[in-house]
Curated annotation (Swiss-Prot):
The active site is at R290. GO terms for molecular function: metal ion binding; pectate lyase activity. This is Putative pectate lyase 11. Its EC number is 4.2.2.2. It is an enzyme of class 4 (lyase). Residues 1-24 form the signal peptide. It holds the Pfam family Pectate_lyase_4. Gene3D superfamilies: Single-stranded right-handed beta-helix, Pectin lyase-like. One of its GO terms (cellular component) is cytosol.
Length: 412
C-alpha cells in the first residue's frame, strides 16, 4: 500500500513534470494555431486537471486552472514571474516580461507622452528590454494620451490598488507577448492625436484614440487576466487588424455598452486567423451587448458567468466560429431580450451556415442560444473524454473575477 507521504511526493513530481513538458512544448508554437481544436482540448484538459487537483494537497480548491497554478503560493510576491506559466487557451504562450527585470512604478502623476520620466508607467512600457512592471503603492494613473505598450512587458498590479482612469488608456500596437494582470481600468476617454513615445528610440504621430480600456491592434500572444473594467467611451477590450493568440480570463466587466469587439470589419479577412479564448470572466451589472462580438475567427467562450445583458450576450458577423461551453447565462427580465446570441449583418439564409455551438451551457430565466451551422462538425465534437467544468460550478470558478486583494506572505 502506498503511504500518504508517497502520494504527496507523487503529486508534486507529476505536477513538476507536467509544467516542464508544457513549457517545452509552448516555446515552439507559432502565432497561429493550425488546429484550433487542439487548443480547445488543451483548455479542457487544464480545467479537468484543476478539478482533480481540487481534491489534492497541492490545490487551493478553486477548480480554476489559472488560479490554482499560482494563488496557492504565499510567496507569490517574490515569485511573481511564475504567473507567466499559468495562462491557458490561445494566449497560453504570452510570457510578458518573464526573465526580465522587475521595474517598480513609483510616480503616478507626471505622465509625459513624449519624454516619459523614469518611475512612470509610460517610461516602463516603452523600454526595449523585457520588463515585469509592478507598483510601489496604491495609485491612480491619469494618462494624457494613449499608453503604447511595447513587446515583452507584464503590467502586474498585484499587491497594490492600481487604477488607470479618466483619460486615454492602453494600446497594444503590433506588439507581442503582453500580460496585463490585476489592474482597474475604467472611465477611459478618447485621446487627442499627437506625438507619443511608442518605443525606446521612436516617437510617432498618432491619431485620436477611441476610448477603449484595452485596444489590441495587430497584437499577438496577449493575456488579460484578473482586471476590472468598466464605463469606457468605446470598448472595454477590442482586438482588430490581425490580432491573434489572445486569452481574456478572470476579468470582471460592468457598466458598459459595447463590451468586446473581436475583428475589425466584415471585409477585413485577415482576421480569419484570429483566435481568442474567453474564460472564467464575470459579465456583470450594467452591460448591454458584445460579450463578445466576433468576426471571421475562432472563439472559445468557456465557463463564464453572464449575469446581466440588455440586448444580447454573444454576437457576430462574417461567419465566425463560436464555441460556447459550460457558461451560465441569466437572461434579463425584459421579454424580447432573452436570446443569448445575435447573428448580425446577414439574412438567415447566410448566418444559418455559421458554426455557432452551445455545449453544456446553463440557460436561466428564459435564456436561449440560437445555434447555427452543422450539427456535429469536428470544430465541436472531437473525440475526447475531457471537458470544461460543469456550468453549475461557474459561480464558484468566477467568484474572484476582477482584481484581487493580495498581501505579502499570504495566499492571494
Amino acid at each position: 500500500m502506498v503511504s500518504y507521504s508517497n502520494n504527496h511526493f507523487a503529486y508534486a513530481f507529476l505536477l513538476l513534470l507536467t509544467i516542464g513538458n508544457t513549457l517545452a512544448f509552448s516555446s515552439s508554437l507559432p502565432d497561429h494555431v493550425q488546429d484550433p481544436n487542439l487548443v480547445v482540448d488543451d483548455v479542457n484538459r487544464s480545467v479537468f486537471n484543476a478539478s482533480r487537483r481540487s481534491l489534492a494537497y497541492l490545490s487551493c480548491r478553486t477548480g480554476n486552472p489559472i488560479d490554482d497554478c499560482w494563488r496557492c503560493d504565499p510567496n507569490w510576491e517574490t515569485n511573481r514571474q511564475r504567473l507567466a506559466d499559468c495562462a491557458i487557451g490561445f494566449g497560453k504562450n504570452a510570457i510578458g516580461g518573464r526573465k526580465g527585470r522587475i521595474y517598480v512604478v513609483t510616480d503616478p502623476a507626471n505622465d509625459d507622452p513624449v519624454n516619459p520620466r523614469p518611475g512612470t508607467l509610460r517610461y516602463a512600457v516603452t523600454q526595449e528590454e523585457p520588463l515585469w512592471i509592478i507598483f510601489k503603492r496604491d495609485m491612480v494613473i491619469r494618462l494624457k494620451k494613449e499608453l503604447i505598450i511595447t513587446s515583452f512587458k507584464t503590467i502586474d498590479g498585484r499587491g497594490s490598488s492600481v487604477h488607470i482612469t479618466d483619460g486615454p488608456c492602453l494600446k497594444i500596437h503590433y506588439a507581442t507577448n503582453i500580460i496585463i494582470h490585476g489592474i482597474n481600468i475604467h472611465d477611459c476617454k478618447p485621446g487627442s492625436g499627437g506625438m507619443i513615445k511608442d518605443g525606446p528610440h521612436h516617437t510617432g504621430w498618432w491619431m485620436q484614440s477611441d476610448g477603449d480600456a484595452v485596444a489590441i491592434f495587430g497584437g499577438k500572444h496577449v493575456w488579460i487576466d484578473h482586471c476590472s473594467l468598466s464605463n469606457c467611451d468605446d470598448g472595454l477590450i477590442d482586438a482588430i487588424h490581425g490580432s491573434t493568440a489572445i486569452t481574456i480570463s478572470n476579468n470582471h466587466m460592468t457598466h458598459h455598452d459595447k463590451v468586446m469587439l473581436l475583428g475589425h470589419s466584415d471585409s477585413y479577412t485577415q482576421d480569419k486567423n484570429m483566435q481568442v479564448t474567453i474564460a472564467f470572466n464575470h459579465f456583470g451589472e450594467g452591460l448591454v451587448q458584445r460579450m463578445p462580438r466576433c468576426r471571421h475567427g475562432y472563439f472559445h467562450v468557456v465557463n463564464n458567468d453572464y449575469t446581466h445583458w440588455e440586448m444580447y450576450a454573444i454576437g457576430g458577423s462574417a461567419s465566425p466560429t463560436i464555441y460556447s461551453q459550460g457558461n451560465r447565462f441569466l437572461a434579463p427580465n425584459t421579454r424580447f431580450n432573452k436570446e443569448v446570441t445575435k447573428h448580425e449583418d446577414a439574412p438567415e439564409s447566410k448566418w444559418r451556415d455559421w458554426n455557432w455551438r452551445s455545449e453544456g451551457d446553463m440557460l436561466l430565466n428564459g435564456a436561449y442560444f440560437r445555434e447555427s451551422g452543422a450539427e456535429a462538425p469536428s470544430t465541436y465534437a472531437r473525440a475526447s473524454s475531457l471537458s470544461a467544468r460543469p456550468s453549475s460550478l461557474v459561480g464558484s470558478i468566477t467568484t474572484t473575477a476582477g482584481t484581487l486583494s493580495c498581501r505579502r506572505g499570504r495566499r492571494c
